[in-house]
UniProtKB/Swiss-Prot annotation:
One of its GO terms (molecular function) is 3-oxosteroid 1-dehydrogenase activity. Its EC number is 1.3.99.4. It holds the Pfam family FAD_binding_2. This is 3-oxosteroid 1-dehydrogenase. It catalyses: a 3-oxosteroid + A = a 3-oxo-Delta(1)-steroid + AH2. PANTHER family: 3-OXOSTEROID 1-DEHYDROGENASE, FUMARATE REDUCTASE. GO terms for biological process: steroid catabolic process; steroid metabolic process. The keyword Flavoprotein applies. It comes from Rhodococcus opacus (Nocardia opaca). It comes from the Bacteria.
Length: 507
């Protein structure tokens, strides 16, 4: 017999958008929940995101008059991902409308469509995008929870947002207010799930630890929902998975460094896929502003060791904007983005020369040949190669055609590029000094590797059987998509499979 300290129907580990969706779904079914958050603030990794959510075919797209549908979304995923995860792909797109319908029943939660193109040219793609976003939130609407949300990414607002509003991923804290309104929850900050409690092969609870005490929490349904972040902040686990880059380069919050001891029969973790790149702070921690690539039209990214230009205005592909695949193990970094003064002027203040952001390395002015020789700290960088490629960009600008990288031919390119007076808005010549180089390293916001699950989020053993009572979603689980089909797929899948897990537990 276990000596239990507290009880609930559903124990939720983590407080990001996916975890909170699972908690709210359970509460809506009449189940009691305890939400454990490792840090002292709620919101998780999703609070650091722009909160685009890839939930296709919902009432939100219908309100916006978009010709979106579950079938179109299914076709798009199948064209990109194949049949390897067809059941989970189907569960994802078929459940998305129900998730949104449930959440919008609560007066605290409302979504809207915001244009952001799907990333790849494939059957079912929507050039306008199909992602939805939570409406900006007035902190007064959620009371004390506003002060318990993950803090702003930076101390200074550089994007002219309305003062006092909770925007982007922080607006998803509204889901926690919805959970709280059910009176069937208990939020527990500064609480680490240090181990799972197993009886006769079934997960029946967990050991909660915080700076003051330890508790044995029983899930009355014999259920634990594990949605507590990935392993991007754990250097040892990254090395075991063969994940490129360093833990200190991750852009995620400090919480996702798994401390839970799992039953030995758990399935192994899948190999992580590199999701994106970012600018790195001088002190080594990844910068919170990650849109430099999207804002610079006329740049070159030169990688190691041969000064090879890489595409700047680009979708988020299987290969990163460095031209480095996950199998390259990060050998192409650091890279340097080279651009001229017009891009500095046109960039938002987060990448401004006159107001350099304190959270990124300051660009270095100088002529292109001088810059490449004196400022790019690798002996194998060749100034003549960089100058040659700058002249090539000039020719592309005059022609309006990028024959090598095809910039400006994809709707995603056009989305980020306002008119520049030329035939191709994605091409701006590198000719107006001073010139700049921004150091670029691999980075990530989370992991795609994790616990292998079925369509209802049940964690699977190595032999494919389900572990009774254990569910996983979000960055804890292996992704349904080995790469990034569109804006908000990680958050969308986290919400859908947390919803499906809670529904399965409520049966």
């Amino acid at each position: 017999m276990q000596d239990w300290t507290s009880e609930c129907d559903l124990l939720v580990v983590g407080s990001g958008g996916g975890a909170l969706t699972g908690a709210y779904t359970a509460a809506a079914q009449g189940l009691t929940t305890i939400v454990l958050e490792k840090t002292d603030r709620f919101g998780g990794t999703s609070a650091y995101s722009g909160a685009s959510i890839w939930l296709p075919g919902t009432q939100v797209q219908e309100r916006a008059g978009l010709p979106d549908s579950t079938e179109n979304a299914r076709s798009y995923l199948r064209a990109l991902l194949g049949d390897a995860e067809s059941e989970r792909q189907d569960a994802y797109v078929e459940t998305a409308p129900a998730v949104v319908a449930l959440l919008e029943q609560n007066p605290n939660i409302e979504f809207e469509f915001r244009a952001f193109p799907d990333y790849y040219k494939a059957e079912g793609r929507m050039d306008t995008g199909r992602s939805i976003n939570p409406l900006d939130l007035d902190p007064a609407d959620i009371g004390d929870l506003a002060g318990r949300c993950v803090r702003n990414c930076t101390k200074t607002d550089r994007m002219d947002h309305a003062p006092g509003r909770m925007i982007g991923g922080r607006a998803l804290i509204a889901v926690s207010a919805a959970v709280q309104s059910t009176a069937r929850q208990n939020f527990a900050p500064e609480s680490v799930l240090t181990s799972l409690i197993v009886e006769d092969g079934r997960v029946v609870g967990g050991l909660r630890s915080n700076p003051r005490y330890r508790q044995r929490i029983k899930a009355n349904r014999g259920v634990l929902m594990h949605a507590g972040g990935g392993f991007e902040g754990n250097a040892e686990m990254r090395e075991q998975a063969g994940t490129p880059g360093k833990a200190i380069w991750s852009m995620g919050p400090s919480g996702p460094t798994p401390a839970t001891r799992s039953p030995p029969e758990l399935a192994g973790r899948r190999r992580n896929s590199l999701a994106r790149s970012g600018v790195v702070l001088p002190r080594g921690r990844a910068a919170r502003r990650r849109r430099l690539h999207g804002r610079v039209r006329g740049g070159l990214v030169v990688d190691s060791p041969g000064s090879v230009p890489q595409r700047v205005a680009s979708v988020r592909p299987v290969r990163t904007s460095h031209g480095c695949s996950p199998d390259d193990n990060g050998s192409a970094v650091p890279s340097f983005m080279i651009f001229d003064s017009r891009e500095v002027t046109d960039c938002p203040p987060s990448a401004s020369r006159t107001r350099p952001p304190p959270s990124t390395s300051k660009p270095e002015p100088g002529s292109v040949p001088t810059l490449s020789k004196n400022s790019l700290p690798r002996p194998d960088y060749r100034p003549e190669r960089i100058a040659q490629h700058c002249r090539k960009v000039q020719r592309c600008r005059k022609l309006g055609v990028d024959e090598e990288f095809h910039r400006g031919e994809d709707p995603y390119d056009a989305f980020f590029c306002p008119p520049n007076g030329g035939a191709n808005a994605a091409l701006t010549a590198i000719e107006n000094g001073p010139f700049y180089a921004a150091r670029d390293r691999l980075s990530d916001l989370g992991t795609k590797g994790g616990l292998v699950t079925d369509v209802n989020g049940r964690v699977l053993r190595a032999d494919g059987s389900a572990i009774d009572g254990l569910y996983a979603a979000g960055n804890t689980s292996a992704s349904v998509a080995p790469f990034y089909p569109g804006p908000g797929v990680p958050l969308g899948t986290a919400m859908v499979f947390s919803y499906r897990a809670a529904q399965d537990m409520a049966k």
